[in-house]
């Protein structure tokens, strides 16, 4: 009831007396409650309060990826891009499935710090650890700017053989369109429209507990109400 009403303080008080909340360990769930409170504090620009609440979340669940994600957002707001980058890397270390959620922010931090070469190294390593297409596309975007669209397209083509992906194919077509003419350009445009239509109506996330599908990341599944069970969908039509 307290969860439904978003009365997180009362929810913490009750959960702290329990071993489990539903099927999930109470300490794990309480960390999420503290993250909710920290998000609320951040929205009110109460960064000191948010930091205190995040510390509590970490005490209950030391490997909480969400806690690091919120900390990264606070650090970016304050212009501390090194701290933000460290926190974002910890998000992916604690839950590699959240890598797609932090790549854009990581890149932005590296740009601010002037360390884009380090980001390229990070992406090469991430590609070996993460089965999805997101780090491949992030690296291809950088290659396109540095070495040109042909180099980026060649890189994506090589990776598509290892991890078939409609998103990857769509980006490959984008890069190829700029270098094509006549009938080849027309055919690529048709293929691009088809891939866009395939992606437009596809969910991006799925709950690992109940199977709920969605296009946005929810920290609590709207279906089964479990915490941190919604992850990116993998495979040809996913990440």
Predicted segments, located by residue:
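Residue at a conserved register position within TPR or TPR-like alpha-solenoid repeats
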Residues: 2, 34, 41, 75, ...
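Short coil turns that delineate tetratricopeptide repeat
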Residues: 23, 62, 96-97, 130-131, ...
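TPR alpha-solenoid repeat register
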Residues: 67, 101-102, 135-136, 168-169
């Amino acid at each position: 009831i307290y969860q439904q009403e978003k009365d997180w303080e009362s929810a913490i008080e009750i959960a702290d007396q329990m071993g489990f909340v539903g099927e999930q360990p109470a300490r794990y769930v309480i960390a999420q409650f503290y993250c909710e409170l920290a998000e609320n504090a951040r929205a009110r620009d109460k960064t000191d309060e948010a930091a205190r609440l995040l510390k509590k979340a970490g005490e209950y669940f030391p490997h909480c990826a969400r806690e690091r994600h919120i900390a990264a957002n606070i650090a970016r707001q304050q212009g501390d891009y090194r701290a933000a980058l460290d926190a974002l890397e910890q998000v992916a270390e604690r839950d590699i499935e959240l890598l797609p959620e932090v790549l854009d922010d990581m890149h932005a931090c590296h740009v601010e710090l002037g360390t884009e070469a380090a980001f390229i190294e990070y992406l090469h390593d991430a590609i070996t650890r993460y089965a999805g297409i997101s780090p491949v596309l992030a690296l291809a975007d950088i290659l396109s700017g540095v070495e040109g669209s042909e180099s980026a397209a060649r890189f994506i083509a090589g990776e598509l053989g290892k991890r078939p992906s409609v998103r990857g194919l769509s980006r490959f077509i984008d890069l190829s369109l700029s270098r094509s003419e006549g009938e080849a350009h027309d055919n690529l445009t048709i293929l691009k429209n088809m891939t866009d239509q395939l992606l437009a109506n596809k969910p991006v996330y799925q709950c690992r507990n109940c199977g709920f599908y969605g296009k946005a990341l929810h920290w609590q599944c709207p279906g089964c109400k479990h915490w941190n069970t919604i992850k990116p969908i993998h495979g040809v039509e996913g990440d």
